Every structure is written in structure tokens, then in C-alpha cells.
């Protein structure tokens, strides 16, 4: 940075070329130098003559003339007298706009504290003087004395307690001390003067050194904190004239006494206007009233002092003056707010700048613009993609100046006046000129709410009659517009540059892709989809079936001649190939570009297929082809939707015949369950869950039957079915409400009402059903209103935190990346690997797991083709560069960001990626919330999980798994954690019998098998091996990773598999709960039908070591008996196309070397008919089982006290149920006394049902008790939006889980004050101790091994803990998967990179742990950039750098902590931000978007970066 010079802002012109902006405290001299005179009188204007009073608040002499170039008395009245001061009235003759910039001042008789520096925490004045804020207020408001000079004064007679400097005394103490010590120099005063003097006499440098010594010498943390607080304020004052550590010559640092006001500046009068209303009344700005009070009190005080009034009166007046100034600056901050005539608080200067209606947000960030208008929109189906219909009336107004010029230029009018008259009379020449003006001049359309960049797009206007704007149907999705009365605003770009940007960047035909996901946004919807779908349907036995047509012309002729039905199946020739298709599909083909393959159009075209088609055309053909294609598609869709004549009739809604039967069956089941409950066989929770499950499955069966019926009706041409099936409108769920049953409904709190609505809308609902329905529907509407506000607020916070992220460089040179894999939740894939790596840059080479060759090297940009190759090659995790690991000094670099999804190319420097990310996340947030009630409040939850099923083939491996066998001989899981069941295939087999050895090198792991005279070594990459914490399910994914089943030194047999690839994994307890029943044994083969997946020749191989040996003796019908059989499908060049592992017990379906011509053929069949279930468990309860055999002892379990008895009437069996609410200190438990005195204790939850009696003998794995799982609640985005908000705000969740910080073995120590004490012992001898509240459920057992990051108790994991314990990359994985789960659950696609940008901003500050020789203070939060710069500076001088740890800030905190003052102030907590900035003399280098918008400059992104280079645009005529 060059040396800055402060620029004085003069009224004649504001400086255009300033580089930075600094906020400072103004000294009294400075305030006086701004002022044009002192305001002495509280008068405003003379109410008779309406002229401002002299020396009053609107005085023309001080502030300038009221009318341009006219003095007040009217002596000088023309431009020629400019600059003359009138002798009579003293007014300078100049323009009246100086009244917006000239300030006055009021000389206060006594210094007054500025309320911001007293009352805004931490109180700056109080902190500097070391006085509490309350005490300081007492001094300032004349209630207490402050010691100026303690002399030798003591509080007590024994002289033990000395009076210190700046002590605060009450009246009594003061009088007492004055009596005794006045002679020894004791002095104390009260009020503003003494505070000002104290501040003026502070020696800041000495204070700074003193405080630094104090810090070094104190050990108390609390004291340190207070000293550090003071130190910060002192440092801020001392450094307030530094800029990046270089002095600014002409500037003195801020002085503490400037926080006291002696000269009060008066705001220029036009900024606090007084407007005459009709009827002789005046609207006056509140600030004027507040100033009047200050002036009144000040003059009164002056008079009283001249009269030598009694001290007490003067004091009172001074206090009132202080209060008046307080009210002016921040009304209501201290005592009660000053109220105006109409009983509402007056708006002070602080209120004027803060809040939504304040100066920042209302006038600086959002301005009204001219050349704009708004009107209702209607559909314009005849428009081209880049056109909009503009009403002639609007165009006439919008283009008026252009039109006037054009009329003169053509010679129709000679003067402007004449031209205006022509326009008013709307003569023919006017319309002719208007057409010419509008041609080639784009306009911008905007629909509020503007949620993302596609809410403002440019169009070429087409003049239309009428008053409504016409909009192209395909851009509605981007604007989220419909035609039920929506309005849109039109803006006219004026400058050549703006017009060029509209044409090149903003034209709607250029914005085909959605920046959030890279999918196309201009996809046909509703009618258009219906038309295209109808066109592509096929009908058996239609007229003209099996005709042969050479091309589209013949088809059209046949259709015209009515000799061919549009749905008839015909044969035709396309690209020289004979194909079977339908007439309608050939019509679709006729509008497609030539490069579209047959499989994209020769099928039934539903909405998804059309979207894929549009995407494909854009990717292959580019913008121009897409735009014209989309227009043809639109026309075709509308034409055939009309010709199809699809309508809805009640007869289309078909109710299944067997509905009543199904319902009666369900009612019967419900009655049975109700009876079991009455008999006490099941708990109330189980009853509720089971009933809901019954109704859910009944509903599903009915819906399925109904869909089948409607599908068969009219051979698939049922109108309602077509609408839903094509994706035009409606869904299966909605049709089933019309025709099957309305189903289960939810209460407003989300719980499901157990009586479903059995009727459907066709039959009609009865009164009760109708009432239950309204319940859900109203909740939907109420929610919508509330949530829109929340979503909008979230968007605003995201924008504010990310607005300064832009692409600054091409490559930051970072080599580290983040390893990513597919995101799954409970075994459901939420986001595939392919989607996640698309458009990203690799951070490490990708190695083909089969051939060990490098597929793609580091630095490759992954496009769709490469992403497909990577996923097909079986790679399960990829390391990519992300904004979080980007090393760019500011912003991000192109390589770490990847593709700009809006255009599908690598992002260019200057792109405002932060704003785009914030919009991409915020926009669907609003969308989601606006759409809760579409399912009409019907409940949607998944059926309870009861089992896990293998989806792939291989064999079973138990990892760390222990099991029990129960009395029925079932295998029961005995682990609570740190165990898993893996499904694997062999990767390396032992070539001979020997001992296995495993050595860990830096990046490799060497596995060797040693026999007497033989040794085989295999080298694996460490990165490919599954880590222990991944196997235990703590972090990351294990599929595709390698697993070594043996430990070092174990003997293995020949051909035993020693390294395996994990195909699927189910960890305990996340995927398989404790006490589940296992249905497989260790080593069991799992077979599935194996599908070829490619055409080619089959070759069978056997794994030997790590290579494949050819085996030729396998033939059709053989059963595989050995581990390690692989089949390879070789293409015509004898290259491997596909490879599959064939597990034991599979049946081979082809001979060796046979040719497979169908990629869907089954090569090997599963030996089992049904699917393979790995484990099963009780879906409704958590089971407690006996771990040892022994005798039962009850503890704190008493019937009628902590438990209740339930009696089964049929069997007379009694069982105890623990009460829901227990007395304090009562902790029911079951103890088992085993052999050898071993005791095991089971803590019981409320509502647990006990299955054993006190004193019973039990066997291992017997069931002791069951706790019902919580009653199911309906899923709704309500959980979604607050969840997203909670994650972005990094809030600590209410019930945070306690998390292990180290790997180790759990030990329970003796409890401490009703808290459980858990100690984790690590292998290296270190340990960590946790005290856990009794209210939390502990999830670990004594002696268990636990990994860092695992939960010790129940609850939600806090993202702060993830960052602290597992680091930034784990946080990246956690936040992205949590946020994506919410959005994908709603079917919203957002690219990961947008979330990453926000997360990187949440991590942009670090916390200083050790300050070294830097200027930082321990515990400071500083931005990474400042931290880096300061450390570089210190290292240059050979000093000790500071050490810091990453912290996660919520988006609000991160936005307020922005390095830019203006940006932070305009976000939230305006007064606080400005207070801090003014004391520290903070600089704002105007690097980012928001501050430049506020100052009205070009914003430094995109085309704004080139503004310095003065590019001029030439117009070609």
C-alpha cells in the first residue's frame, strides 16, 4: 500500500478516487472546522413567513440558502451573484444543495459523554479508566464522585484501606474524606468535566507497559481477562493512526478525551427536513426535536452558571444536558426513551442508520431507480427465448428521452417542447420512432423476491398492445413466476457498457443452466411436458400400424390424410439404420439437432427425459443451438397439448374394487393389536407404532392397486394418469388421495394421528375426517408464512458472510485436498460420488484398482465423461481440491473452485463465487419453505428398519465382532461398538502356507507371507486401507477400501485370502444395533445374480497371490466351490471391459470363452432365491440382554414407586414398567451376579418393560427388558430449514453429545457430585476425563475400546467438537453431508462447492493460543489473513510467530467479524461495529462488494474489475 493521505471531504465535490475509508473519533477542533456557525436558538422556521429563523436549527446564514442562488431577504437573486454574502441577512448566494452537506455546531457549556462509548459493551471510557460501567454512569449523571487525586486518604481509621485513583465514592464517603484529607491533596469531583480531565491526563504508553507487566505477573484467569480487555482498548487508541503498520503522517492518533463531546456537531438541515403538509401542518424529523432539547438545556445551563445558581440546580441541569445529548445519539439506550407529541419514542441518530429501515439498508444498499416500471405478467407463447412483450404505453414512458432525441434526429420535431407534444398526442410518427428506439435496446426484467441471479434477466423487447408484460414460458422456472397475478419490474440499461453487459451476459438465452447445480433451468414444464409426452406415447392396434415411412415428410402427409395415427408404431430409417418408432416420436426427432442419439428420443418422454435431453443439447451444441431448440420444443409441446385435448373428469378417478376388503383387514389387525395392548402384552408405544405401520402398508397397497388400475384404463391414456406419469402436474401420492385413501395425517407438532382418513376425495370425507384434514392444511399455510421469513434471513446472513469471496487467481498451488466419497445416510445414497467429483480438480492421482495404472493425474479437471470412467473403474473415494484447502491470499483460486456451474467451464478470475454460493443455498431454502403444504399435511415417514440386506456379492468378514448364543440357538450381537460386519471380495491370496507379516512404511503398507524357504511381498498404498475408526463407523466411508483380516504373525493356509476389498459394511451400533440376531456366520459366501454389464467373451480366472491365473474348466451349471474366482468380459480387441467376482455357491450360467451379446445377461446365478438378510432386530424396542449367566437383583425398582405393574389377563402374567417420571436420585437398574462374583449393572430408561423377576436365574443372551423406541414423527422440511440454519450458525445443539477426544479404553471412575466420571486410557499412556450429567444416557461400557470422535452419551454431535477433535477435513465431511441430507431429502440439488465456500468463510478466523512476539493477545479472534501477514512480518525480524487454532464461527458472527467496517456495520449491530471501528481508527480498503455498493462505486468483480482499464465500446453502424 502506498502512503495514504487523508482527504478532507469538501462540499464542492466528493473525491472520486479514494482508495480507503477510515473511521475516527472527531476532535473538538475538527468538529469546529466542519462547522459553518453555531446554532444558538432552538427555533426552526417562522410559521408565518415560513422562512428559517436566524441562528436557529435551519438558519440560512449557517447552512446556506433555501432556494438556489437566492439570499433570504431577496436582495441577490441571480446566478451572477454566486459567492457573494448578503450584507443584510448574511446568507451566501449559492446552490441550495449545500444545505445537505454544511454542518453547524453547538458549544456545550460542560463536556458530555458520548453514549456509544459509555453504554456499548465493553464500555470504552469505563475500561480505559478501570471503572465499572454502572459506576461510570453514576459519575456522569451526578450521583457519585470519582477520585482525581487520592493524596494520602484512607477509607478507615486504621489506615489499612487506601483510597485509589479513579475510585468511585458516594456522597457520604466524599464528605467524610474531604473533612479528613482535604489538606493532604485529596480531590474528587463528579460529572462530565472530571471524566474528560481524567481521560486527557491518561498516559497511554505508560498504561500499556503497566498492563503488559500485570499480565505477566498474574496467575488468575479472571484477572487476565479484565486486563486483556483494557489492553485491547489502549492498543486500539495507540494504533489508531497506523495503516497496515505504516504511519500516516498528517494524522494524530485518537485521544481518549475525544470520547467526551464539548462541541456538538449539528446535522445539515436537509438531512433532517421539515416538510410543509397541506393544511398548514408540518412533518418534522425527530432529530430536530432532540436538537431543540439540547439547545434549550444548554442555554439554560449557561444562564444559570452566569447567575451563580446553587450547585444542586446546576448539577441537575448538567445531568439533564447529558441526558438530552444521550437521547440525540441513541434514544432509549439508557433510561426511558424520550417521547414525542404522539407518545411514541423519537428516532435518534442511531436509529436512523440501523435496521432494515435505516440509512444503510434502506437507502445505500437498495435504491429506487429511474427508467423503470412494473406491470402484471401474462404468458407470451409466441416469443423467442430472448424476447419479452413490452406494453407500448410502458415503452413510451421508459424510452422517453431516447424517443425525444429520435424525433428530433428524424426531423419530425424541431424543439423538445414540440416533441413532447407529439408524444402526448401519440401521433403515428411517435410509434414509428419508438419501434426504432426499442430495436436493439435490451431491457431487464426482475421478479421479486430476487432470490438468485436468474431473478433478473435481460430480454429484447417486442412492443405489444394492452397493459401486461408478456413473458416467455420457459424462463418462468428461473423467476419462479406463474401467471396468477404475478407482477414484474422492467429496468432500462442506459450506458453503452450496461447495454453490452445485458446482451452478452444477462440475456435469458445465455442463462440456460442453474448456477446451483449446473442442471438446465429452462426445461419445459406442465402443458409442454404433457404435449411432448402425449406425442411420444405408443398405442397398440392404432391406425396405420407397422407402416414403413422413409422420413418425417411421409409421416406428416399420412397424418394429414388421416391414414396414420400419431401413436401408431411404425418403421423408419434414421442415419441409415432401420428402427421401430412411432409417428409422434419422429415429429419430436424432426426438431432435434442431428447429434442427438436415438436412445434419447425414441422412448416415452417424461419430464426427466426432456430435462436430460435439454442438458445434452446444451452440453453438445452450446448456447445458440439450445436456444432455438428450446423454442421449437416449447411450440411443439403447446401444440400437441392442445391437440391431445386432455381434460379431467370424475370418471378418470377410479377407486379400486378391493378397497373395502383391504380396509376391513386393516381394521381387524388394529383391533387385535388393541386387544394385545389391553391385555398388557405390548406397551403403548409399541401399540401406536404397530397401528401406524398397519395403516401405512394398507395405504401403500391401495395406492399401488389404484395406480395399476388407472395405468390400464384407456390403455394408458387416462388423463389423470398421463398428467402424473409425465411429470406435468400431480404425483402418485396426490392421485392416491383422490382415488385410494387420504391416509394418515399429522398433528401440528409432527406426530401422526393414529386414525387415518379412510375416504378419498372422490368418495368425499365425513365430518370427522374433514376436521382432521383441516388440521394439517392449516398448519401448512401458517408454517409457510413463518418460514419464508426465516429462509430470507438465512439467505441474507449467507450473502453477508460470503460476499467477499471471489476468484482471485488461477492456481494457488495447494497440493492437499479433501478425500470424498458418496454421502449415505442409513444405507441410502444421498449424493453419488459421480455427482460430487463432477467439475472438480483432482488433488491426487487416481489409480485404477485393477491395473494399478494412473487413470487421471493430479490437476485434472473432471468432466462428465471422466467422472463416469472413475466410477466405473470401481474407485470409491477421490481426493479433490476444495475452497476449504485453498491457499489463495484472498478469495479462492479457479482450480480449487472448479467448474462455474452456470456455464459449464472452469471458473474465471473475477467471478463473484461467494454471492453465487449464498444464493444457491438460500434460494431453495425459500422454495422449500414455500412448499410444505403440497402433500396437504399427510404424514410421510419411512417404514421402521428391521434388518440389513446385502446388495452386493462376496463373503462375510466379522471385524472385532463377539456373539452370544441364546436358548433358541440364535446368534446374538454382543458388541456395543467398535465392530462391524463386512462384505468383501479377495484381493490377494496367500500363495503358500506361512506366517503373515505387516510393516507400515511412510506411504505404503507391506504385507508379506513367509515360509521356511519362501517369501512373498505385496505393497499396498496406506491411503487405500480402511482405518480402524472408519471400520467402527466414526468417520468416512469404507466401501472400496482394503481390509487385512489377519494381524501380524498369524499363520495362514495356502490360498487363504489375506487382503480384501470391502464391498459393503455395516457397523455396530449405527447400522446393526446391539442384541440383533445375526443370520450369517463369519466367512459365509453371499451370492447375487451377476449381470454382465458389457458385451464380449467370458474368461474365468482364479486369484493366485495378487495376480489372476486363467482357468478353463468351468462350464454352464457348475457351482463355484473355491474363493477367488473372477470372470472377465473381454471386448473384440481382447481388452478387459468388465470384471466380476463370483462367490462360492454361485451357479455359472455360461461356458468358459462363451460370447455374451446382451449386457443384461446373467453370468452367474445366486444359489438363494430370496434376498440375503445379514441381521434382524426388534424394530420397536431397544433390547437389554444378559451378558453373563447369573442371578437377577433389582435396584430402585419398586412397584408403585418407580415402576407400575401391568397384568396380562389371558395368562395372568405380571410385568413391571418403569415410570416415565422418576423421583430425583432414583435410578432403576437390574444387576446380575455372575459366577466368580462378577457383577454387571444395567441402567433402565423410563417406560422400560421388565421381562424378569428379582432373584431369577438367567442364561447368557436372555432378554431382561425392552425400552420402546420413541413414537415416530413425520418428516417435514421444518426439521430441514432450522437444521440448515443451526449448522450454518454453528450453534451448540441443545442436547450435545459428549465425544471422546482420544482413542482408548473406557474406564468408569467413582462418580463426582451426581455426575458420572468416565476416563479414557490411550495406549501411549495419556488419558482424558469426562464428567457426565445424570440426565444423559451413557452409551459406552466399562472396558470398551473407543475411537476419537465417537459419542460417549446420546445427543447430537456439535460441529465445534468435530473441528476440535477430528480437524477441518472431518468437519468438511460432516457439515456437507448433514446439509446435503436436508436438501436432497427435499429433492433439491445443490453442488457441494457452494456449501464449501460458506464453510471456508465460517473457518476464516483463528483463535490465538500463543502470541509469540506479535501484537496479538491470547484469546483474540483474528482473520487468517491478518494472522499470516503479522507472522510473516515477525519472522522477517527473526521473532517468535504466534500460534493459533482454527475456530468455527456461525455465519452471523463471521459476517460481523468481517475485515471491512462498512460491510459489518450494514449487516447487524451497527452501533457496536461503528463504536469499535472509530476507536481503533479502522481502515476499510474497499476490496469487497458491499462496501463499494454503499459508497456507490463500481463493484470489483466480473466486468467491474476492468473499470480501471478504461475499455471503450465502439458502436458499429
Curated annotation (Swiss-Prot):
Keyword Protein biosynthesis: no
Binding residues annotated for Zn(2+) 1, in chain numbering: 71, 73, 86, 89
Catalytic reaction equation(s): RNA(n) + a ribonucleoside 5'-triphosphate = RNA(n+1) + diphosphate
InterPro entries: DNA-dir_RpoC_beta_prime, DNA-dir_RpoC_beta_prime_bact, RNA_pol_asu, RNA_pol_N, RNA_pol_Rpb1_1, RNA_pol_Rpb1_3, RNA_pol_Rpb1_3_sf, RNA_pol_Rpb1_4
Details of cofactor binding: Binds 1 Mg(2+) ion per subunit.
One GO term (biological process): DNA-templated transcription
Keyword Metal-binding in annotation: yes
UniProt: Mg(2+) binding residues: 482, 484, 486
Keywords (A to Z) from UniProt: DNA-directed RNA polymerase, Magnesium, Metal-binding, Nucleotidyltransferase, Transcription, Transferase, Zinc
UniProt GO cellular component terms: DNA-directed RNA polymerase complex
GO molecular function, one term: magnesium ion binding
Principal EC category: transferase
SMART domains (UniProt xref): RPOLA_N
Names of required cofactors: Mg(2+); Zn(2+)
Sequence positions that bind Zn(2+) 2: 812, 886, 893, 896
Function: DNA-dependent RNA polymerase catalyzes the transcription of DNA into RNA using the four ribonucleoside triphosphates as substrates.
Subunit structure: The RNAP catalytic core consists of 2 alpha, 1 beta, 1 beta' and 1 omega subunit. When a sigma factor is associated with the core the holoenzyme is formed, which can initiate transcription.
Similarity comment text for this entry: Belongs to the RNA polymerase beta' chain family.
Protein name: DNA-directed RNA polymerase subunit beta'
Organism: Campylobacter lari (strain RM2100 / D67 / ATCC BAA-1060)
Amino acid at each position: 500500500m502506498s502512503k495514504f493521505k487523508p482527504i478532507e471531504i469538501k462540499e464542492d465535490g466528493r473525491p472520486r478516487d479514494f482508495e480507503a475509508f477510515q473511521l475516527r473519533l472527531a476532535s473538538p477542533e475538527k468538529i469546529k472546522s466542519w462547522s459553518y456557525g453555531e446554532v444558538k436558538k432552538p427555533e426552526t422556521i417562522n410559521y408565518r413567513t415560513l422562512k428559517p429563523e436566524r441562528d436557529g436549527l435551519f438558519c440560512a446564514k449557517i447552512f446556506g440558502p433555501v432556494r438556489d442562488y437566492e439570499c433570504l431577504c431577496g436582495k441577490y437573486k441571480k446566478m451572477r451573484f454566486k459567492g457573494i454574502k448578503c450584507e443584510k441577512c448574511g446568507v451566501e448566494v449559492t446552490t441550495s444543495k449545500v444545505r445537505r452537506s454544511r454542518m453547524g455546531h453547538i458549544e456545550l457549556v460542560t463536556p458530555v459523554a458520548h453514549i456509544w462509548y459509555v453504554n456499548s459493551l465493553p464500555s470504552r471510557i469505563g475500561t480505559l479508566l478501570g471503572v465499572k460501567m454502572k459506576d461510570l454512569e453514576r459519575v456522569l449523571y451526578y450521583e457519585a464522585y470519582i477520585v482525581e487525586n487520592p493524596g494520602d486518604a484512607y477509607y478507615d481509621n486504621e489506615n489499612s484501606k487506601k483510597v485509589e485513583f479513579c475510585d468511585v465514592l458516594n456522597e457520604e464517603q466524599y464528605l467524610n474524606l474531604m473533612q479528613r484529607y482535604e489538606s493532604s491533596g485529596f480531590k474528587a469531583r463528579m460529572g462530565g468535566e472530571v471524566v474528560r480531565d481524567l481521560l486527557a491526563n491518561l498516559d497511554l504508553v505508560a498504561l500499556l507497559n503497566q498492563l503488559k507487566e500485570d499480565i505477566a505477573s498474574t496467575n488468575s484467569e479472571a484477572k487476565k481477562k479484565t486486563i486483556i480487555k483494557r489492553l485491547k482498548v489502549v492498543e486500539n487508541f495507540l494504533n489508531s493512526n497506523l495503516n497496515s503498520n505504516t504511519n500516516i503522517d498528517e494524522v494524530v492518533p485518537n485521544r481518549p478525551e475525544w470520547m467526551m463531546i464539548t462541541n456538538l456537531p449539528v446535522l445539515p438541515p436537509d438531512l433532517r427536513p421539515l416538510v410543509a403538509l397541506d393544511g398548514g401542518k408540518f412533518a418534522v424529523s425527530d432529530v430536530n426535536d432532540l436538537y431543540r432539547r439540547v439547545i434549550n438545556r444548554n442555554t439554560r445551563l449557561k444562564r444559570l452558571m452566569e447567575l451563580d445558581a446553587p450547585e444542586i440546580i446546576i448539577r441537575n441541569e448538567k445531568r439533564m444536558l447529558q441526558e438530552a445529548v444521550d437521547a440525540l445519539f441513541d434514544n432509549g439506550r439508557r433510561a426511558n426513551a424520550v417521547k414525542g407529541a404522539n407518545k411514541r419514542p423519537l428516532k435518534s441518530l442511531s436509529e436512523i442508520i440501523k435496521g432494515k429501515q435505516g440509512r444503510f439498508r434502506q437507502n445505500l444498499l437498495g435504491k429506487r431507480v429511474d427508467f423503470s416500471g412494473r406491470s402484471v405478467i401474462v404468458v407470451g407463447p409466441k416469443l423467442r427465448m430472448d424476447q419479452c412483450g413490452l406494453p407500448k404505453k410502458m415503452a413510451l414512458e421508459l424510452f422517453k428521452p431516447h424517443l425525444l432525441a429520435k424525433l428530433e434526429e428524424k426531423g419530425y420535431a424541431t424543439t423538445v417542447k414540440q416533441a413532447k407534444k407529439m408524444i402526448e398526442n401519440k401521433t403515428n410518427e411517435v410509434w414509428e420512432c419508438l419501434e426504432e428506439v426499442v430495436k436493439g435496446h435490451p431491457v431487464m426484467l426482475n421478479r421479486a423476491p430476487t432470490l438468485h441471479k436468474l431473478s433478473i434477466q435481460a430480454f429484447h423487447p417486442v412492443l405489444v398492445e394492452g397493459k401486461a408484460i408478456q413473458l416467455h414460458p420457459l424462463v418462468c422456472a428461473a423467476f419462479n413466476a406463474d401467471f396468477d397475478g404475478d407482477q414484474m419490474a422492467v429496468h432500462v440499461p442506459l450506458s453503452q457498457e450496461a447495454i453490452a453487459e445485458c446482451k452478452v451476459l444477462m440475456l435469458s438465452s445465455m442463462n440456460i443452466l442453474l448456477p446451483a447445480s449446473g442442471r438446465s433451468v429452462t426445461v419445459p414444464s406442465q402443458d409442454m411436458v404433457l404435449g411432448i409426452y402425449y406425442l411420444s406415447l405408443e398405442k397398440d392396434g392404432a391406425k396405420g400400424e407397422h407402416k414403413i415411412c422413409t422420413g418425417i415428410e411421409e409421416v406428416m402427409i399420412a397424418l394429414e390424410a388421416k391414414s396414420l395415427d400419431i401413436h401408431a408404431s411404425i418403421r423408419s430409417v434414421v442415419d441409415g439404420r432401420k428402427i421401430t418408432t412411432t409417428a409422434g416420436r419422429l415429429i419430436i426427432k424432426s426438431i432435434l439437432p442431428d447429434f442427438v442419439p436415438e436412445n434419447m428420443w425414441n422412448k416415452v418422454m417424461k419430464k426427466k427425459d426432456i430435462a436430460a435431453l435439454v442438458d445434452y443439447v446444451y452440453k453438445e451444441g452450446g448456447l445458440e443451438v439450445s436456444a432455438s431448440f428450446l423454442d421449437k420444443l416449447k411450440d411443439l409441446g403447446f401444440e400437441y397439448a392442445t391437440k391431445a385435448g386432455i381434460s379431467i373428469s370424475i370418471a378418470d378417478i377410479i377407486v379400486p374394487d378391493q378397497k373395502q376388503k383391504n380396509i376391513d383387514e386393516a381394521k381387524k389387525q388394529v383391533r387385535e393389536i388393541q386387544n394385545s395392548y389391553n391385555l398388557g402384552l405390548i406397551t403403548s408405544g409399541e401399540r401406536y407404532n404397530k397401528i401406524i405401520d398397519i395403516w401405512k402398508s394398507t395405504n401403500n397397497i391401495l395406492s399401488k392397486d389404484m395406480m395399476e388400475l388407472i395405468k390400464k384404463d384407456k390403455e394408458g391414456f387416462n388423463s389423470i394418469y398421463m398428467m402424473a406419469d409425465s411429470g406435468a402436474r400431480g404425483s402418485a401420492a396426490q392421485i392416491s388421495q383422490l382415488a385410494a385413501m387420504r391416509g394418515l395425517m399429522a398433528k401440528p407438532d409432527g406426530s401422526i394421528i393414529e386414525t387415518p382418513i379412510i375416504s378419498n376425495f372422490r368418495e368425499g370425507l365425513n365430518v370427522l375426517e374433514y376436521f382432521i384434514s383441516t388440521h394439517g392444511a392449516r398448519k401448512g399455510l401458517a408454517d409457510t408464512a413463518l418460514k419464508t421469513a426465516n429462509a430470507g434471513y438465512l439467505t441474507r446472513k449467507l450473502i453477508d458472510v460470503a460476499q467477499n469471496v471471489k476468484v482471485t487467481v488461477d492456481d494457488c498451488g495447494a497440493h492437499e485436498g479433501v478425500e470424498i466419497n458418496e454421502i449415505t445416510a442409513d444405507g441410502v445414497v444421498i449424493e453419488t460420488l459421480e455427482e460430487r467429483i463432477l467439475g472438480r480438480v483432482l488433488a491426487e492421482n487416481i489409480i485404477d484398482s485393477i491395473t494399478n495404472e494412473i487413470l487421471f493425474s493430479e490437476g485434472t479437471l473432471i468432466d462428465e465423461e471422466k467422472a463416469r470412467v472413475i466410477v466405473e473403474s470401481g474407485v470409491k473415494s477421490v481426493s479433490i481440491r476444495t475452497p476449504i484447502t485453498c491457499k489463495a491470499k484472498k478469495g479462492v483460486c479457479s482450480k480449487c473452485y472448479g467448474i462455474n456451474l452456470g456455464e459449464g467451464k472452469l471458473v474465471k478470475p473475477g467471478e463473484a463465487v461467494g454471492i453465487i454460493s449464498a444464493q444457491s443455498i438460500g434460494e431453495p431454502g425459500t422454495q422449500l419453505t414455500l412448499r410444505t403444504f403440497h402433500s396437504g399435511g399427510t404424514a410421510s415417514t419411512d417404514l421402521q428398519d428391521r434388518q440389513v440386506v446385502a446388495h452386493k456379492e462376496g463373503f462375510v468378514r466379522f471385524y472385532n465382532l463377539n456373539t452370544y448364543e441364546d436358548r433358541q440357538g440364535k446368534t446374538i450381537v454382543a458388541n456395543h461398538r467398535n465392530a462391524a460386519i463386512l462384505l468383501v471380495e479377495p484381493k490377494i491370496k496367500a500363495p503358500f502356507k506361512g506366517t503373515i507379516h505387516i510393516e507400515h512404511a511412510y506411504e505404503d503398507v507391506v504385507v508379506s507371507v513367509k515360509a521356511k524357504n519362501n517369501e512373498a511381498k505385496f505393497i499396498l498404498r496406506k491411503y487405500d486401507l480402511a482405518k480402524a475408526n472408519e471400520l467402527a463407523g466414526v468417520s468416512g466411508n469404507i466401501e472400496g477400501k482394503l481390509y487385512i483380516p489377519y494381524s501380524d504373525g498369524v499363520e495362514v493356509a495356502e490360498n487363504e485370502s489375506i487382503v480384501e476389498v470391502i464391498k459393503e459394511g455395516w457397523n455396530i451400533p449405527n447400522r446393526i444395533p446391539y442384541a440383533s440376531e445375526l443370520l450369517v456366520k463369519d466367512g459365509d459366501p453371499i451370492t447375487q445374480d451377476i449381470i454382465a454389464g458389457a458385451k464380449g467373451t467370458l474368461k474365468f480366472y482364479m486369484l493366485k497371490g495378487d495376480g489372476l491365473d486363467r482357468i478353463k474348466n468351468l462350464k454352464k451349471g457348475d457351482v463355484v466351490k473355491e474363493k477367488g474366482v473372477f470372470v472377465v468380459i473381454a471386448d473384440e480387441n481382447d481388452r478387459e471391459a468388465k470384471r466380476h467376482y463370483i462367490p462360492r455357491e454361485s451357479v455359472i450360467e455360461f461356458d468358459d470363452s462363451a460370447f455374451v451379446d446382451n449386457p443384461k445377461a446373467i453370468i452367474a446365478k445366486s444359489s438363494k432365491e430370496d434376498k440375503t438378510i445379514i441381521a434382524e432386530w426388534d424394530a420397536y424396542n431397544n433390547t437389554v440382554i444378559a451378558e453373563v449367566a447369573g442371578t437377577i437383583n433389582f435396584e430402585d425398582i419398586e412397584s408403585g414407586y418407580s415402576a407400575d405393574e401391568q397384568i396380562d389377563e389371558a395368562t395372568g402374567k405380571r410385568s413391571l414398567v418403569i415410570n416415565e417420571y422418576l423421583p430425583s436420585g432414583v435410578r432403576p437398574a437390574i444387576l446380575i451376579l455372575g459366577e466368580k462374583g462378577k457383577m454387571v449393572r444395567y441402567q433402565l430408561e423410563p417406560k422400560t418393560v421388565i421381562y424378569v423377576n428379582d432373584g431369577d436365574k438367567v442364561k447368557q443372551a436372555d432378554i431382561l427388558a425392552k425400552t420402546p423406541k420413541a413414537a415416530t414423527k413425520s418428516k417435514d422440511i421444518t426439521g430441514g430449514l432450522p437444521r440448515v440454519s443451526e449448522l450454518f450458525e454453528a450453534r451448540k445443539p441443545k442436547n450435545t453429545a459428549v465425544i471422546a477426544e482420544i482413542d482408548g479404553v473406557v474406564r468408569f471412575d467413582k462418580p463426582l457430585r451426581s455426575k458420572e466420571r468416565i476416563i479414557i486410557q490411550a495406549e501411549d499412556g495419556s488419558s482424558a476425563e469426562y464428567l457426565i450429567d445424570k440426565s444423559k444416557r451413557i452409551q459406552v461400557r466399562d472396558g470398551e475400546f473407543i475411537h476419537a470422535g465417537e459419542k460417549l452419551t446420546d445427543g447430537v454431535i456439535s460441529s465445534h467438537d468435530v473441528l476440535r477433535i477430528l480437524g477441518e477435513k472431518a468437519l468438511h465431511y460432516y457439515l456437507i453431508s448433514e446439509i446435503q441430507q436436508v436438501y436432497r431429502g427435499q429433492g433439491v440439488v445443490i453442488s457441494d462447492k457452494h456449501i464449501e465456500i460458506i464453510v471456508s468463510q465460517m473457518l476464516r478466523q483463528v483463535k490465538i493460543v500463543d502470541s509469540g512476539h506479535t501484537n496479538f493477545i491470547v484469546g483474540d479472534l483474528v482473520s487468517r489473513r491478518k494472522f499470516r501477514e503479522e507472522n510473516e512480518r515477525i519472522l522477517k525480524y527473526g521473532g517468535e510467530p504466534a500460534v493459533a487454532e482454527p475456530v468455527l464461527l456461525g455465519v452471523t458472527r463471521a459476517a460481523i467479524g468481517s475485515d471491512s467496517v462498512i460491510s459489518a456495520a450494514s449487516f447487524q449491530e451497527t452501533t457496536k461495529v461503528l463504536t469499535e471501528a472509530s476507536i481503533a481508527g479502522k481502515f476499510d480498503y474497499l476490496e469487497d462488494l458491499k462496501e463499494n455498493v454503499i459508497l456507490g462505486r463500481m463493484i470489483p468483480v466480473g466486468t467491474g474489475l476492468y473499470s480501471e482499464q478504461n475499455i471503450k465500446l465502439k458502436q458499429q453502424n
